[in-house]
């Protein structure tokens, strides 16, 4: 596992965007051989999406031959709702870059057959071989995507019941009214994430410090689903300074020394 220790959320967003752009450009995608990118929603990736849009407008990257798969979507929320992840992604990213509509894959939380929707999503991912880079965030309780604590580390795309804590955290997007937050969501599984060639998780804020500690210094544990990344051959945690407050000093020093060259120029 790599840990990229930065200072601010803006630096995290810029580093993550730069890494994505470097991966896409090194891959040299074509229509027949697209780069497959997994994407999250929420507050954490906002600085990354902003930086990606800026880099696209500056001519540093094209998304014409990039295929995307989003992590999750609420169940029962109309896709036109401003807080659906369909709306979020178009508002904050897709509408500002040159990605073709047919290359965008989002779970349908209003599908008449939820189980079939989840199976088809997994099948479509497999049809591309694999996701080359899956970007994500982490919840205060260590969940990735909507894989809440005690999720199977072998799980695939499915419907999940959201914990009260997750709904409270997400209520900030729903006028701070937890009753407006859907109780269920479709989400890729932990196993789906682990199948990706590379997984990059961004960690922001002191409220995520225990989750980061569990991911880096703890044991692999389904109560902290983020800890599954210890099993991944190419996992990256990109974090700001407040999120590292629970890490041991020697742990942080170790990763600062390892990544000194990779965090320059931000």
From Swiss-Prot:
SUPFAM superfamilies reported for this sequence: NagB/RpiA/CoA transferase-like
Molecular function, one GO term: glucosamine-6-phosphate deaminase activity
Marked site: Part of the allosteric site: 151, 158, 160-161, 254
Enzyme class: hydrolase
UniProt keyword list: Allosteric enzyme, Carbohydrate metabolism, Disulfide bond, Hydrolase
Catalytic activity reported: alpha-D-glucosamine 6-phosphate + H2O = beta-D-fructose 6-phosphate + NH4(+)
Name of the protein this chain belongs to: Glucosamine-6-phosphate deaminase
Organism, scientific name: Shigella flexneri
């Amino acid at each position: 596992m790599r840990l990229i220790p930065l200072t601010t959320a803006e630096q995290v967003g810029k580093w993550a965007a730069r890494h994505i752009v470097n991966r896409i450009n090194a891959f040299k995608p074509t229509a027949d051989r697209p780069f497959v990118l997994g994407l999250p929603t929420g507050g954490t990736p906002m600085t990354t999406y902003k930086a990606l849009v800026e880099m696209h407008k500056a001519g540093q990257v094209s998304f014409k031959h990039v295929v995307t798969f989003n992590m999750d979507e609420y169940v029962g929320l109309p896709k036109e709702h401003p807080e659906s992840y369909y709306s979020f992604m178009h508002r904050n990213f897709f509408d500002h870059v040159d990605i073709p509509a047919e290359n965008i894959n989002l779970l349908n939380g209003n599908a008449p057959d939820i189980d079939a929707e989840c199976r088809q999503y997994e099948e479509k991912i497999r049809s591309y071989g694999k996701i080359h880079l899956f970007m994500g965030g982490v919840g205060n309780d260590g969940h990735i995507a909507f894989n809440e604590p005690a999720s199977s580390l072998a799980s695939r795309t499915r419907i999940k019941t959201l914990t009260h804590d997750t709904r409270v955290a997400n209520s900030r997007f729903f006028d701070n009214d937890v009753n407006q937050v859907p109780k269920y969501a479709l989400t890729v599984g932990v196993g789906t994430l682990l199948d990706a060639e590379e997984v990059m998780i961004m960690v922001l804020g002191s409220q995520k410090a225990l989750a980061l500690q569990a991911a880096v210094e703890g044991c692999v544990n389904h109560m902290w689903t983020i800890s599954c990344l210890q099993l991944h051959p190419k996992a990256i945690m990109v974090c700001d300074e407040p999120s590292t407050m629970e890490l041991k000093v020697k742990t942080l020093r170790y990763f600062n020394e390892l990544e000194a060259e990779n965090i320059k120029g931000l």
